[in-house]
Amino acid sequence: MLSKRLLNFESFEVMDILALAQKLESEGKKVIHLEIGEPDFNTPKPIVDEGIKSLKEGKTHYTDSRGILELREKISELYKDKYKADIIPDNIIITGGSSLGLFFALSSIIDDGDEVLIQNPCYPCYKNFIRFLGAKPVFCDFTVESLEEALSDKTKAIIINSPSNPLGEVIDREIYEFAYENIPYIISDEIYNGLVYEGKCYSAIEFDENLEKTILINGFSKLYAMTGWRIGYVISNDEIIEAILKLQQNLFISAPTISQYAALKAFEKETEREINSMIKEFDRRRRLVLKYVKDFGWEVNNPIGAYYVFPNIGEDGREFAYKLLKEKFVALTPGIGFGSKGKNYIRISYANSYENIKEGLERIKEFLNK
């Protein structure tokens, strides 16, 4: 019999859609992928070259479980330059992707019966991780009023994802301020930080430079197109980092060595130029998707970050997504996979080429007008 903890895990809706899309492709159909949250760009050349160089130099062994010092120093410098925050390398641990960092963060602070506040809708792994660890996810709107209602004596943490998946929104300052005043721990998932096209996106560091309550999760997958390299990091206080270090030592030893060395080049000027070019292209695609979505008559917020648009289509999103995929071979993610409030929504990922996105949107237009 399987573990009871695993029974609380729900399937990942986007992967179910992807599996069907790939089956259709194996049958010769041309599927337009607007479901996957993965940059279509290749990893910038300086990063790839450094990865190859590290292999040739024999850097294929374990590293310090905290991660190589050079990379932690680079991350420390990044937060000092961007936020004037004095984050020392010892308050940083490198992980095998930001999802692992998130799991470590939750594992280090929550016990059976604790409650963790999460946004509805939000990244599906949040609720699965929380339940797996014996705690309870509490879904709420990210307004002060909703958070006040959700608080209880069992509240241990809140997960703030900004820019958010699937909404593409950034979280308001008042939400951070409320969280720091009322909640023991703030887990700040900032994996899309940097992918912002207008306005201001806060970092938790701006509200808690001493890291008394903050567990900041970030990585290289989204901004640097390094999804397959599996490299992320956690920033927090000494107590939390030491707890995560124990988990890392026992479960994973260290993050992938070649990925750590390759990531050193993420901070180079040449890489920065490539990233800026990617961001401009993402913004161009965002504007294209928003134009079509509004022409379809769908209600939509103003997504200013990440690479998702999350419209209300006025009907069951799951039924719509599967029917669209089978009839027009366009893959979208049903909104219900992100929370109960996503039932009549779909998520459109614009992490695909401009041409493919336009073709996919034209197919949706045909589907709606049939």
Swiss-Prot record:
Enzyme Commission number, as recorded: 2.6.1.108
Pathway(s) this gene product operates in, as recorded in its UniProt entry: Cofactor biosynthesis; methanofuran biosynthesis
Catalysed reaction equations from the record: 4-(hydroxymethyl)-2-furancarboxaldehyde phosphate + L-alanine = [5-(aminomethyl)-3-furyl]methyl phosphate + pyruvate
GO molecular function: pyridoxal phosphate binding; transaminase activity
Cofactor field: pyridoxal 5'-phosphate
Any one GO biological process: biosynthetic process
Gene3D superfamilies associated with the record: Aspartate Aminotransferase, domain 1, Type I PLP-dependent aspartate aminotransferase-like (Major domain)
N6-(pyridoxal phosphate)lysine modifications at: K222
Main location: cytoplasm
InterPro entries cross-referenced by the UniProt entry: Aminotransferase_I/II_large (IPR004839), AspAT/PAT-like (IPR050596), NHTrfase_class1_PyrdxlP-BS (IPR004838), PyrdxlP-dep_Trfase (IPR015424), PyrdxlP-dep_Trfase_major (IPR015421), PyrdxlP-dep_Trfase_small (IPR015422)
Alphabetized UniProt keyword annotations: Aminotransferase, Cytoplasm, Pyridoxal phosphate, Transferase
Record-linked PANTHER family: ASPARTATE AMINOTRANSFERASE, ASPARTATE AMINOTRANSFERASE-RELATED
Subunit structure: Homodimer.
Purpose of the protein: Catalyzes the transamination reaction between 4-(hydroxymethyl)-2-furancarboxaldehyde phosphate (4-HFC-P) and alanine to produce pyruvate and 5-(aminomethyl)-3-furanmethanol phosphate (F1-P), the precursor for the furan moiety in methanofuran.
Record-stated family: Belongs to the class-I pyridoxal-phosphate-dependent aminotransferase family.
Protein name per its UniProtKB record: (5-formylfuran-3-yl)methyl phosphate transaminase
Organism: Methanocaldococcus jannaschii (strain ATCC 43067 / DSM 2661 / JAL-1 / JCM 10045 / NBRC 100440) (Methanococcus jannaschii)
